[in-house]
């Protein structure tokens, strides 16, 4: 039955987000959740967030005049012995006139509410952007072009591409809690320990833990498909699947460490973000067919460009330096220490070890107290204990607008 209404603004819901992921959600959902992921306090009783810049998440489909809203505190708890225990708060963004505080005007004072506005925003106006229905739409990644929240807050990594069947896996990494901005702060990078490689390794480890396990039969099938469709299963070396590494010809990527560790090497996951998809390879490559005695040979020439201002540019350059024609080498920080070898010369008075002198016995020290024992924990034990603090020392991935923007792990 045809509708009697003419086509109007109210009948054509406008998209809310344009982030290169799944199709943007529409206005008018029945849910009351924020469109965006939350920022999370690093510690209990943290002060309300302060922002470098406007504090309004990037949304290309919202006019400048509508770029205003509020961050709302959400208390969080985890189950524990004797009842639930509080954990650091989460803060969610809503546009003015939407969400749990829809009845407030911009700037109205209320506990747990922080108002933000972009330059040029009309804070007297109210938004018609609605809220998110969690049953229909995933939350969207936070991006701040003019700077993010202060160092007391962080947010989890959410890939820009994901389907409803697989909600994002929050991955951790010891990086700054601010996303790289497109201007002065864009060039800031964390130390070498917290760079792209460590983050990528953590992502794939978390996904393997939470995902379905790969059986031995499945792994064998993955490693022995048609050559162009093979993938390296967990526990396999690269040369078990794709043959020995070479120099100057096909199969020249990977050093000895990468070959031995396979996909456990975080550099593999990092570089896969630059590898073209099947469609990109087919339609974006220079394809050269050539008939040979053994069959048809297809050559695909594809170029991926990583801009020099990309936040991960230096990391990609380092990985390429290590792994292109890298057979027979290892990263400098991963070179095995040479084992000491016993001398093959016959013992003489000149090279025989002198008799050891008897050392005076040392007095036994009293046992360390509990607080002293804690100080003697190994680095691995300290790291494990830190993880038990439940987000007390969170790690964050902020990819920003990098070469990874249109890919997901």
Curated annotation (Swiss-Prot):
Homooligomer. Both monomeric and oligomeric forms interact with RNA. Interacts with protein M. Interacts with NSP3; this interaction serves to tether the genome to the newly translated replicase-transcriptase complex at a very early stage of infection. Residues 29-160 are annotated as: RNA-binding. InterPro entries: N_prot_C_CoV, N_prot_N_CoV, NCAP_gCoV, Nucleocap_CoV, Nucleocapsid_C, Nucleocapsid_N. Belongs to the gammacoronavirus nucleocapsid protein family. HAMAP family: GAMMA_CORONA_NCAP (MF_04097). The modification Phosphothreonine is found at residue 378. It is found in: Virion; Host endoplasmic reticulum-Golgi intermediate compartment; Host Golgi apparatus. Residues 70-84, 358-367 have a biased composition (Basic residues). Residues 1-84, 122-145, 164-194, 238-258, 327-409 are annotated as: Disordered. Residues 15-31, 166-179 have a biased composition (Low complexity). This is Nucleoprotein.
């Amino acid at each position: 039955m045809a509708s009697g209404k003419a086509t109007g603004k109210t009948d054509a819901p406008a998209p809310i987000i344009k982030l290169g992921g799944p199709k943007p959600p529409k206005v008018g959902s029945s849910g009351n959740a924020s469109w965006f992921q939350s920022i999370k306090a690093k510690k209990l009783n943290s002060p309300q967030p302060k922002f470098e810049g406007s504090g309004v998440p990037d949304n290309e489909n919202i006019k400048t005049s509508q770029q205003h809203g509020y961050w709302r505190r959400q208390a969080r708890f985890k189950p524990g012995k004797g009842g639930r225990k509080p954990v650091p708060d989460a803060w969610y963004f809503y546009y003015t006139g939407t969400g749990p505080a829809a009845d407030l005007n911009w700037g109205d004072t209320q506990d747990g509410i922080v108002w933000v506005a972009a330059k040029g925003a009309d804070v007297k106006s109210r938004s018609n952007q609605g809220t998110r229905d969690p049953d229909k739409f995933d939350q969207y990644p936070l991006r701040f072009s003019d700077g993010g929240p202060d160092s007391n807050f962080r947010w989890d990594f959410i890939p820009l591409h994901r389907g409803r069947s697989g909600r994002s896996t929050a991955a951790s990494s010891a990086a700054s809690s601010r996303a790289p901005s497109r201007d002065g702060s864009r060039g800031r990078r964390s130390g070498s320990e917290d760079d792209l490689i460590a983050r990528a390794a953590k992502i794939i480890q978390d996904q393997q833990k939470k995902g379905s396990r790969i059986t031995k039969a499945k792994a064998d099938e993955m490693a022995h498909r048609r050559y162009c469709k093979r993938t390296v299963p967990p526990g396999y070396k690269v040369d078990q699947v794709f043959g020995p590494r070479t120099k100057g010809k096909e199969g020249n990527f990977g050093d000895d460490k990468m070959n031995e560790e396979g996909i456990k090497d975080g550099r593999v996951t990092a570089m896969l973000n630059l590898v073209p998809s099947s469609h990109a390879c087919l339609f974006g490559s220079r394809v050269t067919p050539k008939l040979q005695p053994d069959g048809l040979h297809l050559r695909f020439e594809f170029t991926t460009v990583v801009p020099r201002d990309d936040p991960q540019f230096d990391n990609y350059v380092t990985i390429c330096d290590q792994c292109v024609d890298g057979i027979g080498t290892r990263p400098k920080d991963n070179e095995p220490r040479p084992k000491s070898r016993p001398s093959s010369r016959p013992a003489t008075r000149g090279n025989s070890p002198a008799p050891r002198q008897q050392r005076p016995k040392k007095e036994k020290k009293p046992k360390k107290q509990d607080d002293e024992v804690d100080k003697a924990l190994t680095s691995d034990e300290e790291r494990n204990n830190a993880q038990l603090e439940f987000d007390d020392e969170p790690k964050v991935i902020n990819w920003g607008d990098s070469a990874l923007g249109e890919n997901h792990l």
